[in-house]
Amino acid sequence: MSKRVQPAWQAPKPAERPKLRLYNSLTRQKEDFVPLDGNNVTWYSCGPTVYDASHMGHARSYISFDILRRILADYFGYNIHYVMNITDIDDKIIKRARQNHLFEEYAGESANLPLDQLLGHQKEVLVRFQETCAKNTDPDKKVMLDKTLQRMNDAVVALTTAVSQGDEKGIAEKRQHYLNEAKDPIAEWLDGKKGAEINDNAVFESLPRFWEDQFHNDMKSLNILPPDVLTRVSEYVPQIVAFIQKIIDNGLAYAANNSVYFDVNGFDRKEKHHYAKLVPEAYGDTKSLQEGEGDLSVAEDRLSEKRSANDFALWKASKAGEPWWDSPWGRGRPGWHIECSAMASDIFGSTFDIHTGGVDLKFPHHDNELAQSEAAFNESEWVKYFLHTGHLTIAGCKMSKSLKNFVTIQEALKKHSATQLRLAFLLHSWKDTLDYSENTMEMATQYEKFLNEFFLNVKDLTRHVLSEEPRRQFDAWTDVEAALQKKFSSSQVQVHAALCDNVDTRSALDAIRELVSASNVYIRDNKSRLNSLLLRNVATYITDLLHVFGAIAGPRGGIGFPVSGGAGPQAAGGDLETTVLPYVQTLAEFRNLVREQAKALKAFDILKLCDDLRDNILPNLGVRLEDKDGGKFAVKLVDRDSLLREREAKLAAEAEKAAEKERKKQAVAAAAAAKDAQRRVNPKQMFLGETEKYSAFDENGLPTLDKEGKEISKGQVKKLQKLQQQQEQRYKEYLASIKEA
């Protein structure tokens, strides 16, 4: 072959790279993720039923969905069309809205009610509530109801006592206290008496509107991306009616007394259909099915309308005191399960890629969604991948709204930042149970601090190189840089493999922790010559990954957490660090010169002022100033609240150290005092006070009989004699010391 012709080229063999696999509840195993339409992903997420404050159970789902969504979009590069619903028509909403309205009216009128009438009402409330307590079989809920009953009774006793004492001011206070303590039982009693009289639709609209706004505010505070499309049930009633009609036309639903029910057994008999795909073991679980029907839809007359106890409502005939919409079957409202089916199908059609929701919704809600949707389209599959987030417990205990054992999102945000909450979720599998506890949050807080210290160090160590000597960022590449680069590359491989494996963020963060630890060792061992470009590459990669995970908001490309300290949208403002740091740096340099001069002159008052600037003034401005050996220093912009917490923790640790020192000092003094007191005891009297052990003594004070009158054994007598002899020696020393004095 002529040398003037190019030689044959050997193509590299492609390496095996992991593919994204997701745990699919429809198969109960991890499956390769293959969208229906190339790189485009259609995704429907179950949204909230808006009748109360959002709590950490909601956060468990929506933060986890947001993490999954961001990673699929920003890491794996899928084009995601994300739809979420708002359930604003529901039995819970109807009942809560009615009860709130009636209670507010009653509370406003109660100030003018004669006391005997108020107390008469109280007796009726008590009887009804006692019936509720008696019917309840859940032990945890029974405890909660009993506590409510006790508080209500205590409030009544306090009110009647104030009346008997003629205390007018006390009566007004105790009356209000009773209303506060007995709010739920009173509202339940009022609903039973007057609920059917409520016919103003505004009552049923204002409650969900208010709580929907609060929900969106909570999601924004948690740095959760808004959906691309938001569907409200109240705006989809015509589409829901049409969807139900399709199921009837396909012979799998039937009307009864102005309601419409899904024919579960008829559906399951069809060859292409399968009821309860997610939880087949639950087929026939009428208790769960009834819970899914709603509080206002399980009366005996409603249940008797069904052909089978397995059937569930697609359309509910509205009774007096319930909102209604027109339909071919009469005035009513949609059933809970049909709402999501109709809305998702209106946006996506007969099939879509991903459906997400909490694990507690698997049966009956999601199984019913699947059944009625497949019945409407006469297809065997409506959703390809069903992803369910795990339960959330509160310090190891089951969280339950009915038990009033829940932490609202706003309450959680008062204790921890949105970043810390998200890190807590990232450090756990999205599909497993997460325990929201002090230990969990401490783990997240420490991880955040660990990363933040690394980011601050990298920025401080490389800042001067970039601004003053940019050539030094390309320092010679030695074995230590090669080793860190190798660790960096292997960590990227580990992170990718973890994210491909069912979006395992916990393992990804473990790999990041190891990479940061290796980088910290590199910094420690190579202070005289650091490759700033390599360090910044590592820090930028980790920061970018945290952006992808939603733990950092704002534009990508920087290093570290935003100076505001949060993951929320406030962090997305201008580059505060670039703007402020030059001024802070100048102040720090001036302080350093003053400090060095003060040391030379032994001007301790000036040194104290320099320390005060470092320890008290700058932290209040979000600036951490660190004095280092050799007259050097480091300036770091940190979230002000974090710095103040650090300072408080440092002061608390110092106070505890001082207290421990004082405790030890007092213990030594007490031991010395006890020893001195022991020396003063006459050996003949040392056992006489131990009457709980002995009942008789000889002329030398030695015990002869135990407390039961039995003679002391010879072996025991010898031990007591030895103790007495030792005391005799101490006593002689004491007497001698007195004579010398």
Swiss-Prot record:
Q: What does the entry list as the binding residues for ATP?
A: 401
Q: Which reaction does it catalyse?
A: tRNA(Cys) + L-cysteine + ATP = L-cysteinyl-tRNA(Cys) + AMP + diphosphate
User: What Gene3D superfamilies does this protein's entry cite?
Assistant: Cysteine-tRNA ligase, C-terminal anti-codon recognition domain, HUPs
Q: Which GO terms describe its biological process?
A: cysteinyl-tRNA aminoacylation
Which cellular compartments is it found in? Cytoplasm
Copy out the cofactor comment.
Binds 1 zinc ion per subunit.
Indicate which residues form the motif 'KMSKS' region.
398-402
Name assigned to this protein: Cysteine--tRNA ligase, cytoplasmic
The organism is Drosophila pseudoobscura pseudoobscura
